[in-house]
């Protein structure tokens, strides 16, 4: 399944015009730049609106809260990473090492901008039911990243789907643990490799 465009609205909402899509991209770029510089607290909706050159009311029509906005930023980051890995896929013949390699590369991409990673993960942690559709899209993008790394033809088996869910949870937990200083980079890598080995189970 190809990833959705970062400018695409959530499923069930009307398609954006070209002008609306460009406005949404500007908003996401502005939020990303603020998060890179100062993390979650630096992303203030008024500053995002000013940087994106949109009215504050317009910003809230696109993203009802900062949490909605930063979850959308995370989706955009995952989609960009997905495209990069599709162009440069892992080369191992077995699925478990391919998945471990993919998630390790994803972790390193987030590691390069720790304040942005902190902002996105905090937004996911704060998300309530009103952000459910956006969180589901992030989860689907993460799951698709893992499924693509498995690299098989045809739909995944039920055991593979179960393994992907556990691997996805491990990935998120490892990222939170690293951001909070409870896990080292080496421990994150080890956890990702351990979780990926679930794919070898019958």
Model features per residue range: what roles?
Residues 44, 117-121, 132, 158, ...:
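Short, hydrophobic secondary-structure boundary micro-motifs
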Residues 26, 34-68, 72:
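Helix-turn-helix
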Residues 72, 83-112, 164-167, 189:
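Hydrophobic alpha-helical connector segments
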Residues 1-22:
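N-terminal intrinsically disordered/low-complexity leader segments
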Residues 27-35, 77, 106, 171:
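Short hydrophobic clusters on alpha-helical segments that form packing/core surfaces
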Residues 70-77, 134:
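Alpha-helical DNA-contacting segments of helix-turn-helix folds
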Residues 79-82, 128-154, 158-172, 190-198:
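Amphipathic alpha-helical packing segments from all-alpha helical-bundle domains
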Residues 109-130, 147, 173-176:
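Amphipathic alpha-helical segments used for helix-helix packing
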